[in-house]
Amino acid sequence: MGQDLPLLLSAALGKKVNRPPVWMMRQAGRYMKIYRDLRERYPSFRERSENPELSYEISMQPFHAFKPDGVILFSDILTPLPGMGINFEIIESKGPIIEDPIRNLNQIENLKELNPSESLSFVGQVLSSLKKDVNNEATVLGFVGAPWTLAAYVVEGKSSKNYSLIKSMAFKEPGLLHKLLDHFAKSIGEYLKYQIKSGAQVVQIFDSWAGQLSPEDYDIFAGPYQKKVVDIVKAEHPETPVILYISGSAGVIERMAKTGIDIISLDWTVDIEEACKRIPSGIGIQGNVDPGILFGNKESIKERIDNTFNKTKDRKYILNLGHGILPGTPEENAQTFFEHGKKLTY
């Protein structure tokens, strides 16, 4: 049975593998010409991510180009929001805009319970097609946004530099925010279960903005709700590996390890050797490579990959970037990342 599992899934489960698996956050996207050409034909991000044929095609673009060990669903962390009654749009140069930001009790009480098979059936379609067509040549990954990050978007109404609106709610009306976070935790847990049933073999939780919290506030507003999502998933799918990623996580790594996840995805602001000492040995590590290195020459990319890998010693490790690959990254440098990553050996 172990031989039939794809490499990334085997590694995530802690099985013995010959090399670390490699994939990239945002591996399908703007740095690829084939994606930019498709975007010209379909300028709406929501159409690209919610039309199952387009989402499937985009998800597969990097698989055809680079053969990564993971194929991640092309979607967005905000995709489940309309199913809860929160509408949004993604403007190309500005990012997400929430049409009616959530800022009072009445709005929170009127949120719908998410029914993924009803409002997100296109996601299920894409994942089941990926699982069938990738055929265990790679691991199919699903993903969600964590409650704190979703709340940050819906309260602020858009991306924010200082998060003053959600922090104002956190410190003036914490009960209100906890109600919103709890709603999101239940809905996101259900959404992840739906992704797994549809074909996702490994799932990643993005709490992109939890790094904006002090460790003390992380313990109040982020960690408990990450754990609630994980608990909901693990109750039904105890064997499915769960990865947690936070941007700017250096101050909360130990706390991340207490949420029940299997793998911590590191950004590049922490030394991976130090992180290995701070994270319990049973928990795997992913990422840590600065995406900016992919603007360098091939030798510097290879050297950084080698240095990062060598510091992980005998840890369960998945080669990835410390953030999504950046727009404008030369495609041949992404190719180097994947090719060199596959040459690593234990």
UniProtKB/Swiss-Prot annotation:
Keyword vocabulary terms for this entry: Cytoplasm, Decarboxylase, Lyase, Porphyrin biosynthesis
Reactions that this protein is recorded to catalyse: uroporphyrinogen III + 4 H(+) = coproporphyrinogen III + 4 CO2
Molecular-function GO terms, alphabetical: uroporphyrinogen decarboxylase activity
Coiled coil: none
Recorded family membership: Belongs to the uroporphyrinogen decarboxylase family.
Biological function: Catalyzes the decarboxylation of four acetate groups of uroporphyrinogen-III to yield coproporphyrinogen-III.
NCBIfam families according to UniProt: hemE
The protein's name: Uroporphyrinogen decarboxylase
Species assigned in the record: Prochlorococcus marinus (strain MIT 9215)
Gene responsible for this protein: hemE
